[in-house]
């Protein structure tokens, strides 16, 4: 296989990466299982996004706990601080997220 960029993983992170690369490049996304068998596709209960600063510490603590406290704290901070812009980008790309009866996005936190 010849490609300019190889992305390993077809979950949300891998696909978001592919969407943000130059269209002039040959991009290949590979996955170890079917497209509907990755953790992003199988996730339940909505998504996480920093709604305001009062939510930061809880979001940070939950993320660290989910990673068994092996996460790089600086990376977790970047992920949390950029979560709103990532969600906005995904909506622009046409992502179909769960919404409530009022049409508002459903969040886990």
Labelled PLM ranges:
Residues 4-29:
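N-terminal Rossmann-like FAD-binding beta1-loop-alpha1 element of flavoenzymes
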Residues 35-109:
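Conserved N-terminal/central alpha/beta ligand/cofactor-binding core
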């Amino acid at each position: 296989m010849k490609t300019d960029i190889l992305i390993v993983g077809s979950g949300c992170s891998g696909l978001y990466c592919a969407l943000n690369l130059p269209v002039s490049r040959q991009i290949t996304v590979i996955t170890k299982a079917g497209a509907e068998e990755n953790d992003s596709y199988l996730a339940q209960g909505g998504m996480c996004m920093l709604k305001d600063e009062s939510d930061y510490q809880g979001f940070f603590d939950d993320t660290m706990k989910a990673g068994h406290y092996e996460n790089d704290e600086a990376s977790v901070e970047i992920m949390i601080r950029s979560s709103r812009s990532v969600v906005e980008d995904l909506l622009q790309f046409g992502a179909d997220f769960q919404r409530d009866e009022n049409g508002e996005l459903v969040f886990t936190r």
